[in-house]
Each structure stands twice: as structure tokens, then as C-alpha cells.
């Protein structure tokens, strides 16, 4: 009989729990198989699966892609080899399923029918784990989209059986013992976007357990500890659970605070016991969650207990006694708070950062969380992945749940909540649409942004009147690098790092920053200068560091510094205080330091460019300096149009004429004129329903223009100095007394 040996690889996210094996076309030809046929997979045990064709990237690779449950049934791991041959499957007359010991499952009234519908046409061998997806309308609830492992206790006839419409499916309530291998049901297929991290953890954890001889040959000790660190919600604990399931090693879990006891010496005793149990049961894995809570830096803690626990952990992990085949995996989101003695080779040899997923990772995670969901055709997961910058796995899970809840709300009016059973016709009609995800997106924000999240202003470029040159400048500097980075790559240049908008008050600098934030779809962090300054030494700099760290984490991001002059005045001048000097230093290192500012754009606005520290205004930091000056006649007319679009105007009103007369008025002045004119009209007649030209003229008498000749001269002078590429001349401040800056 034809058979081949293939290497086991991880299944595609959508195949998890479906009993599918993916083979390349050559193997299918060699074994005379066509898609939909049944094959036997022989590892340490024999199981069966249905064959499908693999994607193009897996052709000619000698691999078979099967999910975690099929791997557990065949008792093989990823990277091991299995024998494949065509199976003679008979129709199953009866199939008896029971939950494993540790699963708590209650079966509802129509549970057997539900399960049968899910496993129709699936091959089963006795003692197989048969995963059943729990969906939102399932009679036994786990979280939707998670597989519940049931065990095939007996099949009639024996051997490879196929579940058909005629099969009698029985469910037994009492759990079946002797099945250690069902685990918590979490496999590598349940983890999206961490391909490299999984690979690194596996070579550290699985290799020493399965093939210790490799390390003996190389004459080295296998690694003993892995520290997973990264922002909350990225999947550190999930990865540890999957590793425990897939390696078939004994698994011991320590939740940080649980082992701390009030009695002297008891915390250390508990820790010693766990390590001793692990040694007796080796090969084994000890997982410590929230490591920073039980092993903080000893110089920072006041309590004696924590110090003793840290010392005990250090001796257990690398003491005089060998600790056998015991690997310690720990997770923390505050890696800098962990005692440095733990972070050396021999204790935690490897530190693996589990970061925020990129676009491809987010799409994988979305596929995992929506695989049990009836999606309508208009849901495009790759566009969704594109819209969820900065989301971690936990945020995406929350997004999927929120979308499903919104879909449910649509059907709620049709459901009679007093009835026990919901009609199957309604359940089959339930579907999650694109609008549900859109609505969910507005409610779920990335968890890393919670402290700094700004509601995105709904302001577009159309709301910014005039200023065409300044607008184009800002678009080139900010929108191109974020939306079309390939332009810069093609030309072989780096995009600008930061943009400084300067100009008289009221010209629309902040408005432009808001429009940019809205148009780029980037995350927007707004920093108001004075908010960052603190009376405690080091706090202001820390706030700036954290702002930039968050921005890098949830990139692409636009950081907007309003009133930069209050935050970064020139250093070394009389009257300057130490705080602002330290803040300037921190800003300089963040903007052009050793760390890359990938996909983070910085925009700042100021109306006093002359007092900003000159080191900030050089290329590589704020390298685009854009003057937002007074609008021309066309611009003023546009601004008036924007501000009077909701105002009923009389027939005699000519906005063009008003624009021609409004020389020296900036955007905020014109907005003021529009408002004053409406109030004038109401003064004349409380029941007035339109605003006439006379009202506008009266309003112009009351509103003074912001811009004077002296002021414009001052800004032109500043611009000339910028173009001469020296920082603004400090002496210009002596002349600024009569310009209106007191």
C-alpha cells in the first residue's frame, strides 16, 4: 500500500478544529487522493483526517498541515514526521462521545443534534479527541469560538469511521478518565501573529525535552528559563498555555501573589515545593505569571517577604542542586521592575518580547476570533486589520465580541426571552455584518492608548479655509510618509521627522493638526505643553518618554505638541528654569536619538518661534518649518463661507466684498465677525431670520484685526532667519515689544 512520510506543520487559522489535513498536489497524486478523501495519519497513535489541498506557498515542501487536536490524536508535535496513507473509511452506525475529566460541560436538550450537525462527514477513530466549536447559540457555553474537546469513547464498527446522517450520536454526561492529553484545548492555532515568537519558544522548550542528545553532542546545557515580556493583552499567558499543551510535559502554574503568605518562611516553602514536584514529574514546565509581583527589585521593596521570595527563586533557578528537566517560563508586562539577578543567563536565558502585532498579525488574530462566527460577505478582515492600528490580541477579541453583541441586538426584538428554545430558523438567519464591526470599532480603543487617547476631531481639509501653500506643505510632510511611504523609498530619502507650524495667533495652526490627524487614520496623541510640567524632579521628562514610547507601540501615530514655546524654551537664558531645560534635552533625544521613530510623526504649533530652543529647529528634528500666515482674499472668502454655511444670509450679502475689506483679519477673527453679525441681526430684530450686509459691516467695526504690519514684519523676519538656517535671532525679541507681544 502506498504511504509517505511527511513533516508535521501548524494548521491554517481557519482549519482549526475541522479535522482537515492539508497536503500538496504532488503528494495527493502519489497517494491517488482527491480533495475530500480520508487518510490515516500514523504517529505514536493512529488517527484519521480529511484531505484538502494546501496553499501554493506549501507546495513541494513535504509537509502536512494538521491542527492541534489531530496532532494530539496522533501524539506528534510540530516538526516531527508521520506516516500518511489512504484510509478505507466505513460509515459509522453509532458514535459515543463523552467530555474529558477536567472539562465542565452541561449538555442542553438538543445537544446531540447540534454536535452531529457540526461533525457530519468527519472521520473518527475510537479514543480520538473530537473538537466541537462552541458558538453563540450552543447548548453548552464556553466562550464562543473556542473548541470543546469531546472523546470518542466507542465507535461501531471499529477502525476509521465516517459520521453520516444515519449515524446515531450519543452524548454521555459523566466524564471519561485517563485522558491527560486534552489539555485546556489551546493549541498553536489559537495564537495569531506570533509566528517567530512561537518558533523561538519552541526551540527552547521542546528541543531539550524531546531531543536532549543534541545538547549533549554540542556539549552545552539546554536553556532553562524564558522570560516573556510585552504590553498587556499581547498573548504571553496564552503562549505559555499552548506550549504546555503541545509539549505533553507536566505543567505547574504559579500566579504571583498566590504564594505570598503571612507566616514566616511559608512563601519560600511553597516555592520550594512547586520546584520539587516539578523535578519529580520531569520533564516539566513551571509557568510564573506576573513575575514582577513576586520578584521585584530588592532595593525598591520595603517588605522583608518579597526579598526572601526573590532570594529563594534565585537559588531554586540556579542553585547548587541541579533542577533536572525543568524549564521555567515567566511572563510580565513590567520587565524593568524585575530583579536584575533573575535576568542573567542560567536563570532566564532568553527574554522574548511579545509586542503589538503588525497588520498581518492582526488579520491572523481576527481570523481566529471570527472563525466560529457567521460573517456576511461584506466583512473584509484585511481592511479591518488595516483599521486597527495599535490593537493587541485582547483588544481584537473584545472587538469581535462587541461586533457579535451588536448583531445580536438587531435580532433581539424577534426573540421571545421567556421561551426556553429559540427557533432554529432564527438562529440560522443570524449573521454579523460589516456595520457591526464598524460600530464596534468606535467603542473599542487600543488598550495601550487608554491613558492618552484623544477623541479624533471630525475635521477635514475642507474645514480649513485658505492657506493652500501651508496645507500642501503639511500634507507632503505628514500624509505622504504615513499613507504612501513608497514614494520616499523610491527616491531613496528619509521622510521629514517633524513639522513646526508657526504664525500669528488665530491663523489655524491647531486646526490644521486636527485635520491631519483625521485624514491620515493614524492614532493621535495630543500633548499640551503646560500639562506635562510637574513639580517633581524627573516627572516631566518621564511623561515625554512615556508619550513617545506609547506612540511607537501603537504606530502609525501623530504626536501633536500645542504651544511648543511653553514646553521647550531656549536653554541657558536668564529666567529659564531647570525643568524646562531638562524637558528640552529629553525632547531632543526622543526626536533624534538612537531609537528609530518609525511611523511616528511629530507636529508642533507655536506663535513664538523666536523663543524655542534652536537645537529643536534643525534638520532631523523639526525639519519642515511651515509658516501659517494671514490668508489672502480668496482664503478669507473661503473661511467666511465655512463660518456662514449654516447662517441664513440676506440677498445683499457679498462675501467677496467682505473678504476684500477684511485685510489683516485671520481665521479666528473672521469666525468672530460671522458670529457678531448674527448677534447684530438679533439685536435689530429678535425675530430676524437672516443676516444682512449692514450687520456684517457693524460687526467689522467691533472686531479688530489681529495682524498689524509690525507683526507681519516680525514673522517675515523670523522666516528669513529660518531660511538662512540659523535659529531665530534672540535679539529680535527686543524689537518684539511694540509688536504686540508684551
Swiss-Prot record:
It comes from Halobacterium salinarum (strain ATCC 700922 / JCM 11081 / NRC-1) (Halobacterium halobium). The lineage of its organism: Archaea, Methanobacteriati, Methanobacteriota, Stenosarchaea group, Halobacteria. Keywords: ATP-binding, Nucleotide-binding, Repeat. Belongs to the AAA ATPase family. CDC48 subfamily. This is Protein CdcH. ATP binds at residues 230-237, 503-510. Residues 723-734 have a biased composition (Polar residues). SUPFAM superfamilies: ADC-like, Cdc48 domain 2-like, P-loop containing nucleoside triphosphate hydrolases. Residues 722-742 are annotated as: Disordered. One of its GO terms (molecular function) is ATP hydrolysis activity. The gene is cdcH. May be part of a transduction pathway connecting light to cell division. Pfam families: AAA, AAA_lid_3, CDC48_2, CDC48_N.
Amino acid at each position: 500500500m502506498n504511504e509517505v512520510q511527511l513533516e508535521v506543520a501548524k494548521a491554517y487559522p481557519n482549519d482549526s478544529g475541522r479535522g482537515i489535513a492539508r497536503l500538496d498536489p504532488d503528494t495527493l497524486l502519489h497517494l491517488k487522493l482527491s480533495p475530500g478523501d480520508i487518510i490515516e495519519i500514523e504517529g505514536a497513535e493512529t488517527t484519521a483526517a480529511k484531505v484538502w489541498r494546501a496553499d501554493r506557498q506549501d507546495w513541494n515542501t513535504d509537509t502536512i498541515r494538521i491542527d492541534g487536536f489531530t496532532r494530539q490524536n496522533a501524539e506528534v508535535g510540530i516538526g516531527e514526521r508521520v506516516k500518511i496513507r489512504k484510509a478505507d473509511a466505513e460509515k459509522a452506525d453509532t458514535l459515543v462521545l463523552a467530555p474529558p475529566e477536567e472539562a465542565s460541560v452541561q449538555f442542553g436538550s438538543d445537544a446531540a443534534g447540534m454536535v452531529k450537525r457540526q461533525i457530519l462527514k468527519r472521520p473518527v477513530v475510537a479514543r480520538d479527541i473530537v473538537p466541537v466549536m462552541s458558538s453563540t447559540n450552543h447548548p453548552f457555553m464556553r466562550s464562543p469560538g473556542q473548541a470543546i474537546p469531546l472523546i470518542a469513547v466507542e465507535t461501531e464498527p471499529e477502525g476509521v469511521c465516517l459520521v453520516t446522517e444515519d449515524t446515531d450520536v450519543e452524548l454521555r454526561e459523566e466524564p471519561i478518565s485517563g485522558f491527560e492529553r486534552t489539555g485546556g484545548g489551546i493549541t498553536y492555532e489559537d495564537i495569531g501573529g506570533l509566528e517567530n515568537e512561537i518558533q523561538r519558544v519552541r526551540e527552547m522548550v521542546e528541543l531539550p525535552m524531546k531531543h536532549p542528545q543534541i545538547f549533549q553532542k554540542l556539549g552545552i546545557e539546554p536553556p532553562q528559563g524564558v522570560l516573556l515580556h510585552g504590553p498587556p493583552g499581547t498573548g504571553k499567558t496564552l503562549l505559555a498555555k499552548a506550549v504546555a499543551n503541545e509539549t505533553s510535559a507536566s505543567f505547574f502554574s504559579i500566579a504571583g501573589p498566590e504564594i505570598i503568605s503571612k507566616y514566616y518562611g511559608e512563601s519560600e516553602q511553597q516555592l520550594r515545593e512547586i520546584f520539587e514536584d516539578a523535578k519529580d514529574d520531569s520533564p516539566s514546565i513551571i509557568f510564573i505569571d506576573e513575575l514582577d509581583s513576586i520578584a521585584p527589585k530588592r532595593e525598591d521593596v520595603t517588605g522583608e517577604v518579597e526579598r526572601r521570595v526573590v532570594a529563594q527563586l534565585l537559588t531554586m533557578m540556579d542553585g547548587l542542586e541541579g533542577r533536572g528537566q525543568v524549564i521555567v517560563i515567566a511572563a510580565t508586562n513590567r520587565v524593568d521592575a524585575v530583579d536584575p539577578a533573575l535576568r542573567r543567563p542560567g536563570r532566564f536565558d532568553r527574554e522574548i518580547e511579545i509586542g503589538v502585532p503588525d497588520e498581518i498579525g492582526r488579520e491572523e488574530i481576527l481570523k481566529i476570533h471570527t472563525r466560529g462566527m457567521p460573517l456576511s460577505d461584506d466583512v473584509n478582515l484585511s481592511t479591518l486589520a488595516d483599521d486597527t492600528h495599535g490593537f493587541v490580541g485582547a483588544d481584537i477579541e473584545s472587538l469581535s465580541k462587541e461586533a457579535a453583541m451588536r448583531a445580536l441586538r438587531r435580532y433581539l426584538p424577534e426573540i421571545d426571552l421567556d421561551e426556553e428554545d429559540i427557533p432554529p430558523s432564527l438562529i440560522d438567519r443570524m449573521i454579523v455584518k460589516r456595520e457591526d464591526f464598524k460600530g464596534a470599532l468606535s467603542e473599542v480603543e487600543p488598550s495601550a492608548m487608554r491613558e492618552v487617547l484623544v477623541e479624533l476631531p471630525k475635521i477635514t481639509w475642507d474645514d480649513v479655509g485658505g492657506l493652500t501653500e501651508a496645507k500642501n506643505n503639511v500634507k507632503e510632510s505628514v500624509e505622504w510618509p504615513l499613507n504612501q511611504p513608497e514614494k520616499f523609498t523610491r527616491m531613496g530619502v528619509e521622510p521629514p521627522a517633524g513639522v513646526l507650524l508657526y504664525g500669528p495667533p488665530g491663523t489655524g495652526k491647531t486646526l490644521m493638526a486636527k485635520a491631519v490627524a483625521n485624514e491620515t487614520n493614524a492614532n493621535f496623541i495630543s500633548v499640551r505643553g503646560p500639562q506635562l510640567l510637574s513639580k517633581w524632579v524627573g516627572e516631566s521628562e518621564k511623561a515625554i518618554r512615556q508619550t513617545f514610547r506609547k506612540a511607537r507601540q501603537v504606530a502609525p501615530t501623530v504626536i501633536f505638541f500645542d504651544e511648543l514655546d511653553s514646553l521647550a524654551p531656549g536653554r541657558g537664558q536668564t529666567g529659564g528654569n531647570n525643568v524646562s531645560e531638562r524637558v528640552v534635552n529629553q525632547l531632543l533625544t526622543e526626536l533624534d536619538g538612537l531609537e528609530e521613530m518609525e511611523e511616528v510623526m511629530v507636529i508642533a504649533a507655536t506663535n513664538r518661534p523666536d523663543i524655542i530652543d534652536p537645537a529643536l529647529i534643525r534638520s532631523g528634528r523639526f525639519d519642515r518649518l511651515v509658516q501659517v500666515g494671514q490668508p489672502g482674499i480668496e482664503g478669507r472668502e473661503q473661511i467666511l463661507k465655512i463660518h456662514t454655511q449654516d447662517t441664513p444670509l440676506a440677498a445683499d450679502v457679498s462675501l467677496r466684498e467682505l473678504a476684500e475689506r477684511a485685510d489683516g483679519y485671520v481665521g479666528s477673527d473672521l469666525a468672530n465677525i460671522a458670529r457678531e453679525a448674527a448677534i447684530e441681526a438679533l439685536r435689530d430684530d429678535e425675530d430676524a431670520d437672516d443676516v444682512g450686509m449692514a450687520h456684517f459691516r457693524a460687526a467689522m467695526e467691533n472686531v479688530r484685526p489681529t495682524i498689524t504690519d509690525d507683526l507681519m514684519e516680525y514673522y517675515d523676519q523670523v522666516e528669513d532667519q529660518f531660511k538662512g538656517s540659523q535659529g531665530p535671532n534672540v535679539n529680535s525679541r527686543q524689537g518684539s515689544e511694540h509688536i504686540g507681544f508684551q
